[in-house]
């Protein structure tokens, strides 16, 4: 599970459905990304989209993803 991603979403007061809509994907696909079931290796397109949705630099998303990967 990508706890960091859930934390960002909650801080921005967004639902999974809202994030999915902003990314142009279904709520269930976004849920799978957040739960680590999809995009096990997050690609640049998804990382860029998340950075836009959460209004953070893409480098922040990449760093959080790398930290998460290293801790597993």
Per-region residue spans from a language model:
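The alpha-helix within a helix-turn-helix
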Residues: 9, 20, 51
């Amino acid at each position: 599970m990508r706890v960091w991603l859930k934390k960002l979403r909650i801080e921005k007061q967004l639902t999974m459905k809202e994030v999915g809509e902003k990314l142009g994907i279904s709520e269930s696909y976004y849920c799978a990304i957040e739960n680590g079931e999809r995009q096990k290796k997050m690609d640049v397109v998804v990382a860029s989209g998340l950075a836009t949705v959460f209004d953070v630099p893409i480098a922040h998303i990449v760093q959080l993803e790398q930290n998460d990967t290293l801790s597993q």
